Amino acid sequence: MRLRHFAILTTTCLTLWAPTGCSAPPSDSAPAEAQAEIPAPTAGDHEVLPSERLAERLLTANDLGPGYAARPAATTASPEASVEGCPQLEHLGNAADNPYAMFPNQGKRVFTGPGGTQLTEELYSAPPKDLSAGVGRIMTTMGACPSYRLVTPTTVAEVRTQTVPVPRLGDEQWGQVLTVTAGGRRTIVQQTVIRAGAVLLVVSGSPAEVTVHAQTALAKATAR
């Protein structure tokens, strides 16, 4: 199966192995514990937001604090990857090879953080019913295989997936952790997905950073 950045998490993992990517955490890293449950605002009127308004609601480096900087938008395509051992992921090769592309209203920003870490925030907007059904299918498919191999022209990585609990923010929440092992290094990447009304937030990065910044991102994304 040949896919190009077939899933947001896999794109993040590929970036982590690039020379300009983030340094891997220590080998004994583990998913951070979920923070205390704190209510967050939801989009009560379920208004679908255009991409321009979503872009205004993305986090900035100032929102994240010292040591963070926004990365320039990518000018080249992600490396093509083959997935071995998980035929279910083939379904995520549709919609421009991005499973979230079914939601045309979207915004994205990538940050580098202290120590060379990477944090990615994405916002999407669609009717709540469409967001709920679409993301449910995506996360079910991405979690269908507990392990598989990710092969690029320069890297062969063993990937293990784990569904994890996330704070009860917004209307619906999903969480997944990927443990990627290649070249003697192990990298752990978490993706937290939160739907609040007609807005969908996707935050990917190290478990600790995702746990710390997801609530701030949701508050800004759903602010009136």
Stretches with model-predicted labels:
Residues M1-C13:
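N-terminal export and membrane-targeting signals
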Residues L59, A69, K129, T140-G143, ...:
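Sec-exported extracytoplasmic/periplasmic mature domains
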Residues A157-K220:
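A short, solvent-exposed beta-edge/loop patch
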Residues V48-P50, L119-A126, V203-G205:
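Second-shell loop/turn segments in exported
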Residues E52, E56, N62, A133-G136, ...:
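Solvent-exposed, polar/charged alpha-helical surfaces in well-ordered, non-transmembrane soluble domains
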Residues S23-N105:
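N-terminal "mature-domain start" segment
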Residues W17-G21:
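C-terminal motif of bacterial Sec signal peptides marking the signal peptidase cleavage site
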Residues Y68-V180:
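A small/polar (G/S/T-enriched), proline-flanked helix-loop surface module common
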